Structure formats: C-alpha cells, structure tokens
Design a protein with these regions (language model features):
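Short, glycine/charged-enriched secondary-structure capping and boundary segments
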Residues: 74-75, 124, 142, 163
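N-terminal leader/linker segments that precede catalytic domains of diphosphate-processing enzymes
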Residues: 1-73, 80-98, 102-112, 116-134, ...
Length: 209
C-alpha cells in the first residue's frame, strides 16, 4: 500500500505550505483563488486509519451534536496543528490518541494524500496509516460521540457515492460547488471527509481490486 501514496517523512511545516500553494493553483475560479490566497488558511492534519483485520476498513468518527462547529458530522481523527507539533504527522497521531485512544505504537504511517482545502478556511494534510487490529478504544466524549468503520470494499463500489450541488457567499463572492456524499448505514458522509475519501478512492481504485 505504501507505494500508492505520497511519502511524507520530510513534510516540514514549510513543505506543507508549499503543497498548499500547489493545491490552490488547481482552482479554476480566479476570484475564488484570489480570495483563498488572501485569507489565512488554518493548517490542520487528520489521520486516515486503515484497520487491516479482519477486513480492510477505515475508522471514522461522529462528532457530538452539542458542538458549536461541525456538530454531528462524520470526520477523521485530527485537528489544528499545534505550535509544539514537529510536523503534520505528529498532529494526526496526537489527535488520534486524544480522540479515540489509539496508541502511537499501533499506527504505521504509509504516506499522505494531497492537501485538502476547505471552504471554511482549513488546509488539511491527510495522513494515511495502517493498523493491524484494534481491540479497544477510549473515546473523548467532548470530541467523539461514536466511531464506526467504512469497509474499503464499500468505498470502491461506484454505486455507493454521488455528488450534490450547493452554493455559498464569502466576502461578497458567490461560490457554486459540487461535493461528494457517501451514505453508509445510518451515516451521511459528506464535505471534506467525503472529499478526502474520494481522493483515497481515486488512488485505490483498480489497484487492490
């Protein structure tokens, strides 16, 4: 699996900023690009934990309904990069332990996806990892309401995701955009989480089937 992803042993904070600029240049709307470049994007990192046993599946969390931001949404473990974190990998691993109790020694980082930029002003480094098996978790009740697992086989089935359209205004500019939705059981995975999962899908599709 590690050969499929960007290798991130040397992703310093400076390299993260450079990768963000590379991602920004992919925007086709010049006004949107200009607006994003002027705004202060908050550096963040998430862990995409792939649990190998008994079948490959991705750990996801549901945020508590009482939260002020992103209440009830589905997300990966992760958060803002702390000034004491040496790199985005450190952030992703630290946040994962704090949120769901997975220990550092159980996590094997195998690479990263492209930087993901959100409409709410975050630049996210998705760190891909594999975990052989996990028998117990310790959830932070203030950050995580529950966890569940999305089988990779489900993600790779084209029938299990689709696009929706929406629009919003920021600084007087209207943005029209499409976003992915991945319905799974009683969960609706959308927004940045679904976007990063679809980036993972693009890499894995045809490689492990």
């Amino acid at each position: 699996l590690s050969k499929l992803f960007h290798q991130n042993e040397k992703i310093t904070h400076q390299r993260f900023k450079a990768l963000t600029e590379e991602t920004l240049t992919r925007f086709h709307n010049p006004k949107a690009l200009e607006n994003l470049q002027k705004s202060k994007l908050t550096p963040s990192a998430v862990l995409i934990p792939i649990i190998l046993q008994p079948e490959p599946k991705i750990l996801l969390t549901k945020r508590p309904e009482k939260l002020k931001d992103h209440a009830g949404q589905i997300s990966f473990p992760g958060g803002k990069i702390d000034s004491l974190d040496k790199d985005p990998i450190e952030t992703a691993i630290r946040e994962t332990y704090e949120e769901v109790g997975i220990k550092r020694d159980d996590i094997k980082v195998i690479g990263n996806l492209d930087v993901y930029i959100t409409g709410t002003g975050y630049r996210i480094m998705p760190i891909v990892s594999i975990i052989d098996t996990i028998n117990s978790f310790k959830l932070s009740i203030n950050e995580v309401e529950e966890i569940f697992f999305l089988p990779i086989s489900y993600l790779l089935n084209d029938k299990n995701h689709y696009k929706e359209s929406a629009s919003y205004s920021k600084n007087g500019i209207k943005f029209d955009y499409d976003y992915y939705v991945i319905p799974y059981r009683d969960y609706k995975i959308w927004g940045a989480t679904a976007g990063m999962l679809m980036n993972l899908y693009d890499i894995l599709k045809g490689k492990i089937q």
